[in-house]
């Protein structure tokens, strides 16, 4: 940027100098007004007058010189001069030089060319590149001192680290692999959900490898000019060949490596041209020995099959969500830079954050540190981590939102309905927290936290989730009547309907339809797939699917209604507890379900306050329709209910 500014300043100074040299030359000597000149002529003091247009260079008889200008055309001037015997000399008007004439005639065109070059450089982001460098690669080569990340900074994905660490070992000691006839993979594709550490793992490879490391984004190839993408791919591999052995890292490769196909428009697809060139460079007629391509994406399903075949991306490394041990390791990495209180236990936090990615855990530690800073604390304690977890899972509190008592009561019944059904149906995740404080876009939230990491879900668990989703709407219907049911359950209905339809059409949980796939393919057209979609079911089958979905929802809807009707005393007691405390945790919910006095939440301002959640009769256990809930430690499915 500084070089460009200096260059333009130099050009401006040169142009100003040229204009000044081409301008009319100023006359030497002093200037005198025209009336004084006429008076001196009449007094016979002027010896010579050189007339050049309206300018007169005067030489007096005493040899003094000066210049004057004729303000208006004076027809008597020449007669007066001759009468007084003044020598009159006429001079032709000054003509511009040949160089000045050429410059003036070409200046507009040169100005337009300069403006065009300037804008082309700006559009290409070429602060330091020439106007014709569109096809040059934007890959940046990183050296050892530019990246400090190592494998020690990557945690929670040990298998992925082992896969990519093998590449680094090969680059350091290729003979150890070659003597056994082994060949290093030409390409490694890192696949995983967002935030799991794919790019961080690539940074660690760059920090560990002692070879040149080129990094580029998939969106840096294609721009406004045709052929730029393919040219940049060629240039990138040419640079890599000169620096071999080396590593090329392409982040978000799905931006350029999407599936080729029909698509829309029917015209030339610049992205396909770029992809074709990349396929040739990775494994074409000419080999690229010593160049390892590493790419990252969270959409492997949209990549072109030719890009994924052996010889291009030989190995796919799955970087998935971390398990409880991986989450603990990730938390310890991020906690190094945070002053911690003695009560901090990373294992406890890891068990309470199933489904969190590495980025989520980094955000958790940062939010906890911010909460501690707001409270002017010197260390971060478990209280701040609990607040940060609630904020990430349920959204930020909106205490400034004004709600009437009637709205609070309706929200309390709604959330209590979710919580009670979730505790009574089998195989459901435990209730972690219920609140009627508005969070995010919801007026209240019922959060279920799984007891462990889940891989799959049973039919019973899915039906329990459907019943729980309708618990909030049913609580409103039972308390206020069908005519006063609110729209707060709109998201619950949407989630339950999609869940039931998937059970019928994808997961084979319908006796009438059997274990067959009835769902339509949902690939987007712009991903290069065909525009036309085949219909694989008849109208009669579609009607049966709708009937099965409706029957599944009605069965679980009626089950939830029966559970709430049988436990109305708990519903009222939980509403009272929510109206008093606004937020209740698992211990308070345990007291309510057992019909005991509700203990106050931790940190409550009135430690002696209690709420008799039971009825006046003898305590009795809640009456579930199905068998009691049995914990499933292998399950990580959770819901954030309470769209109320």
UniProtKB/Swiss-Prot annotation:
GO terms for molecular function: ATP binding; ATP hydrolysis activity; ATP-dependent peptidase activity; metalloendopeptidase activity; zinc ion binding. Its EC number is 3.4.24.-. Residues 1-4, 120-644 are cytoplasmic. The chain crosses the membrane at residues 5-25, 99-119. The keyword Endoplasmic reticulum does not apply. Its main location: membrane. SMART domains: AAA. It is a multi-pass membrane protein. InterPro entries: AAA+_ATPase, AAA_lid_3, ATPase_AAA_core, ATPase_AAA_CS, FtsH, P-loop_NTPase, Pept_M41_FtsH_extracell, Peptidase_M41. Acts as a processive, ATP-dependent zinc metallopeptidase for both cytoplasmic and membrane proteins. Plays a role in the quality control of integral membrane proteins. This is ATP-dependent zinc metalloprotease FtsH. The gene is ftsH.
């Amino acid at each position: 940027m500084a070089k460009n500014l200096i260059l333009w300043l130099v050009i401006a100074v040169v142009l100003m100098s040229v204009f000044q040299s081409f301008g009319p030359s100023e006359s030497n000597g002093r200037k005198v007004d025209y009336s004084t000149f006429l008076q001196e002529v009449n007094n016979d003091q002027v010896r010579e007058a050189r007339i050049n247009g309206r300018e007169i260079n005067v030489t007096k008889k005493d040899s003094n010189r000066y210049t004057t200008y004729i303000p208006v055309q004076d027809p008597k001037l020449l007669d007066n001069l001759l009468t007084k015997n003044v020598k009159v000399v006429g001079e032709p008007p000054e003509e511009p030089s040949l160089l000045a004439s050429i410059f003036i005639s070409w200046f507009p065109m040169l100005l337009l060319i300069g403006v065009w070059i300037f804008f082309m450089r700006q559009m290409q982001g070429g602060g330091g590149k020439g106007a014709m460098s569109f096809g040059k690669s934007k890959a940046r080569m990183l050296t050892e001192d530019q990246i400090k990340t190592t494998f020690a900074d990557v945690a929670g994905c040990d298998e992925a680290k082992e896969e990519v660490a093998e590449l680094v070992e090969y680059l350091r000691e290729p003979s150890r692999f070659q003597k056994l006839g082994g060949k290093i993979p030409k390409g490694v594709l890192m696949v995983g959900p967002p935030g799991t550490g794919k790019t961080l793992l690539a940074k660690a490879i760059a920090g560990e490898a002692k070879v040149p490391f080129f990094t580029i984004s998939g969106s840096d190839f294609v721009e406004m000019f045709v052929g730029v993408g393919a040219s940049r791919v060629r240039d990138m591999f040419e640079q890599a060949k000169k620096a071999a052995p080396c590593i090329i890292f392409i982040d978000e490769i799905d931006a350029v490596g999407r599936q080729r196909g029909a698509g829309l428009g029917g015209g030339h697809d610049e992205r396909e041209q770029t992809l074709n060139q990349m396929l040739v460079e990775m494994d074409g007629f000419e080999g690229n020995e010593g160049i390892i391509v590493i790419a990252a994406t969270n959409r492997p399903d949209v990549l072109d099959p030719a890009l994924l075949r052996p010889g291009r991306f030989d190995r796919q490394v799955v970087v998935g969500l971390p398990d409880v041990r991986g989450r603990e390791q990730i938390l310890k990495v991020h906690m190094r830079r945070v002053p911690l209180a003695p009560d901090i236990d990373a294992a406890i936090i890891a068990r309470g954050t199933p489904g969190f990615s590495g980025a989520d855990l980094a955000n958790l530690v940062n939010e906890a540190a911010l909460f501690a800073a707001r409270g002017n604390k010197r260390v971060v304690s478990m209280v701040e981590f609990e607040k940060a977890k609630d904020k990430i899972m349920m959204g930020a509190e909106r205490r400034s939102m004004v709600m009437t008592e009637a709205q609070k009561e309706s929200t309390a019944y709604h959330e209590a309905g979710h919580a009670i059904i979730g505790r009574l149906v089998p195989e459901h995740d435990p209730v972690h927290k219920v609140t009627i404080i508005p969070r995010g876009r919801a007026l209240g939230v019922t959060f279920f936290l799984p007891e462990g990491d889940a891989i799959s879900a049973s039919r019973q668990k899915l039906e329990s989730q459907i019943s729980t989703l309708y618990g909030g709407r049913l609580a409103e219907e039972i308390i206020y009547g069908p005519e006063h049911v609110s729209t707060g359950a709109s998201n619950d209905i949407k989630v339950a309907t999609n869940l039931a339809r998937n059970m019928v059409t994808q997961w084979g949980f319908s006796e009438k339809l059997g274990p067959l796939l009835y769902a339509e393919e949902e690939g987007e057209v712009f991903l290069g797939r065909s525009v036309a979609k085949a219909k694989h079911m008849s109208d009669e089958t579609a009607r049966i699917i709708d009937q099965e979905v409706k029957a599944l929802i009605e069965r679980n809807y009626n089950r939830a209604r029966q559970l709430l009707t049988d436990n109305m005393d708990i519903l009222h007691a939980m509403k009272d507890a929510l109206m008093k405390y606004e937020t209740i945790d698992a211990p308070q919910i345990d007291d309510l379900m057992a019909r005991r006095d509700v203990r106050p939440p931790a940190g409550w301002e009135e430690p002696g306050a209690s709420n008799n959640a039971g009825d006046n009769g003898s305590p009795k256990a809640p009456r579930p329709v199905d068998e009691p809930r049995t914990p499933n430690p292998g399950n990580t499915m959770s819901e954030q209910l309470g769209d109320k």
